[in-house]
Design a protein with these regions (language model features):
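S-adenosyl-L-methionine
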Residues: 26-62
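Conserved SAM-binding loop of SAM-dependent methyltransferases across substrates and taxa
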Residues: 1-9
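Class I S-adenosyl-L-methionine
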Residues: 110, 114-182
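A short glycine-rich, Lys/Arg-flanked "PGG" loop and its adjoining helix->strand segment in the class I
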Residues: 81-100
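Conserved SAM/SAH-binding beta-strand->alpha-helix loop
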Residues: 18
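Conserved class I S-adenosyl-L-methionine
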Residues: 76-78, 100-121
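A short SAM/SAH-binding and catalytic strip from SAM-dependent methyltransferases
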Residues: 49, 55-56, 60-82
Length: 182
């Protein structure tokens, strides 16, 4: 709900597959609305991997957030990871040119997977860390989410990266050199 405070003129839509998580967020939104907050926030229960393309039109989104996604540790389940080459095409379609894709996790292997796939995609370029120091959304994903606070309590590490949606064909050749992404 922190994002609804940071971006009061934007609609904040959370998409989640787990019914329990949706119920918790719905309850928090309801409580926040009683206090006059979170009027621009909602959560929908859906399978993003099946239905994302049905929710958004081309260039509709300014920002996307992938916060503490399920790492699907088993190699046989890596295809279920929310960031992969196939779904990055959908995300690039919905994200406007110049829009930002924020990722954060406490699992180094997942971070490496996400950055490898985003680095390899022709429609995303990484935003340098120096540009993010004052970004309130970047700060919020590190400090304001329940999962981020849990990682802090457990003295864990957080790994974050932000990518900008770029115009077709504008990615530098050196950044798109041939590589195998698994």
């Amino acid at each position: 709900l922190e994002l609804s405070k940071l971006l009061p003129k934007d609609l904040i839509v959370g998409l989640e597959i787990r019914p329990q998580a949706v119920a918790i967020v719905e309850e928090r939104i309801k409580k926040a609305r009683e206090d006059g907050q979170a009027k621009n926030a909602c959560v929908l229960r859906c399978n993003v991997m099946k239905h994302f393309a049905h929710y958004f039109t081309k260039g509709q989104l300014d920002k996307m957030f992938f916060t503490f996604a399920d790492p699907h540790f088993k190699r046989s389940n890596h295809r279920r990871r929310i960031i992969n080459q196939t779904f990055l095409a959908y995300y690039a379609f919905a994200l406007k040119v110049g829009g930002l894709c924020y990722t954060i996790t406490d699992v180094k292997d997942l971070y490496d997977w996400q950055t490898r796939h985003l680095d390899a995609h022709p429609l995303f370029e990484r935003v340098p860390e120096s540009e993010l120091k004052e970004d309130p959304c970047y700060i919020a994903i590190h400090n304001a989410t329940d999962e981020a606070k849990k990682v802090d309590r457990n003295e864990g590490s957080k790994f974050a990266a932000v990518y900008r949606r770029i115009k077709d064909g504008t990615k530098k050749a050196s950044a798109t050199k041939a590589s195998t992404v698994v």
